[in-house]
Amino acid sequence: MEKISQPPQEYRSFMSVRELTISGLLAGITIFLGITGYGFIPLIVMNATILHIPTIIGTIVAGPKVGVVVGVLFGLFSFLQTLRAPSLLMQFALQYSVLYDAFICIVPRICIALVVWALYRRLPCGTALRTGIAAVAGSLTNTILFLGSFFLLVGAPYAAARGISVEAVGAMILGIVGMNGVPEALVSGIILSLIHISEPTRL
């Protein structure tokens, strides 16, 4: 009987059925949390977001490919949200440059998966602790790169439009990181450290 040859490695699917399923499920959860408002937790002075948590979960459960895919979809959803109902900062970024706005929304979300995967695989501690640490780092990556990208790309034009110094814009962004980013990171770390997350398996 003639053997059926296996397809060459380069023609194999980029993602397995399991990875595609997890990516779709977590992307759907991200969009649901954003549309319904359940992805925002009211704190004393602001709202913390947990929209990045599905990206972190996907990275830990199924590896960096899934994390990147969910992060891209998270970023695309954020970009579409800026077109529909932008915040004051993102409204300016959108008016200044649609490409800059897309970069600010999407690229930091991709980096979440890269940071989470690197830390989760290398930390020499128990699963719950390294999950919490990786989640905190992933959340801070999202906040710092998002606001940092805004500052680098449109910080100077924003300062000129508002009649303030670039240093004042930088101070404002640092304040947002402290007031929003740190509580969000702590919330993410606590939530994920309490969830049992299994090791990603080779398929």
Q: Which residues are covered by each model-predicted region?
A:
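Loop-helix junctions at membrane interfaces
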Residues: 1-198, 202
